[in-house]
Amino acid sequence: MVDWSTCPAQDSPARDAWLLSHIQAGEGEATLQEITVEANGHLGRFYVFAEPLKLGGVRINASAALQQQIADALGCVFLTPRLADLVFANRSVTLPPMPRPITSSTAAMIEQSDKVGAAVPPGASGIVDTEGKYWVLVKSLFSASAKAARKAANYGWHFEGSSFQGLKGEPTVSLPGVRVIQGVGTVHNDQHTDYSQIVRLVSRTCEVDGQQRDLADVLMDPDLAPLVSHEGPLPGWRQPDVTEAPPTTTVTPGGGEETPTTTAPASSGGSSLARKAAGGVALFSALFLLGRALARLLGDLCWTGAIPASVVNDGYKTNK
């Protein structure tokens, strides 16, 4: 049971710890939805959150550093800009961006979530977009200067047409005729959060050419990366310099009715892989991801400090 009255009122290390503890305890709410893409002669199936991660019905806000900790706990990876575009292209429900005066308070998090939720039609299923902006993986994050400054990259708030409420935005990285209020920007560091930064992730477990793969490997593979990255292979697959932890829950591929992220979505309408996941695939995924994470931890000399409060945001205008 999530009691939001016990959550710290402002963005802070204490609030980050509160959110993370609930997610690690398996109280997060999300549904995985399959998206299919072809590139370089390969066919990939990837499993994204149909809606942003919720906790007690609230779409949570997170810094890039906190989102990485959440992704680790759930066996997931950040979206790339290309994957964010694919989410929009595969949406079943279209919502307009809903900007407001900049704030990172808990009250604003809840208010914004309620406003977005009220716009979702009752009984809606499939992918709902656009609900906010995403922390994403791009090549520039892995440069020495970006790592030294602990940079994060954000992207999102898709819309169709030439402008939205007077904002021209920028072209998306891969969708003709679609623009984003927030083009790929690296103004913020990995500690920043605000009401617009929601948590939409993609499962590490994916399928390429009919074979189960780890998305972490796909992202760095020169031949396969174009499936998920407009930049080709990335130098890494996690937000840099956030200590990796083994998953505490496992999100397995599938679709169908909304289920907690701690269990595999069960639906006869899901993919063939989803139906297989109920048994051996789910166990394999959990052990596979746990083994990889533990192996990396043995040699991990990364920063392990607490996540400080967010820096000041410059609003919902395009950040560069």
Model-derived segments and their meaning:
Residues 31-61:
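Extracellular adhesion/carbohydrate-recognition regions
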Residues 32, 43, 73, 154, ...:
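Extracellular structured ligand-interaction cores
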Residues 52-58, 73-74, 187-188:
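Second-shell loop/turn segments in exported
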Residues 64-131, 201:
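Conserved hydrophobic ligand-interaction patch in extracellular adhesion modules
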Residues 102-172:
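Acidic, glycine-rich loop-and-strand cores that form catalytic or ligand-binding grooves
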Residues 186-261, 273, 286, 290:
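Low-complexity, Gly/Ser/Thr/Pro-rich intrinsically disordered linker/tail segments
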Residues 271-297:
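Single-pass alpha-helical membrane anchors
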